[in-house]
Amino acid sequence: MNLSTAIISCLCIGVLSYENKFQFTGTVYCKSNAPWCVRIRVIEVDTLVDDGVASVDFCSNEVTQTYDIGGVQENDGLLDRNFELQMVVFHNCSRNTETVFKTGIWRIPLPKAPTVHAPIRQHLNLNTNNSQ
């Protein structure tokens, strides 16, 4: 591929970008004798560099805490027609040090127009480091 073809391809991809809105809701469960904190990052997994879509940080001394976060993603990686969304969860619930775990990946086809996607509901159990 020569340089002019690459530049035209990049311009076309830029023109075809449009806003996709995502909403993430759920419950975080942590049975702890002390206040606990969590940071939830939603990323769009790409081959080279993952994109940040949404994030929330909070602390609680309750056993359950709900979350509701929204984010926007304009496009996906080159030659990829799906959003690959994943939560990365940082917390101090099950240990005295920070623990990190990742949820499974949601594959969402790239729409042909701006879209508000249905909410993605995810329950997070910080004591067992898993999601449902």
UniProtKB/Swiss-Prot annotation:
Superkingdom of source: Eukaryota
InterPro entries named among the record's database cross-references: DUF870_CAE_spp
Pfam families on file: DUF870
Name by which UniProt lists this protein: Uncharacterized protein B0416.7
Organism: Caenorhabditis elegans
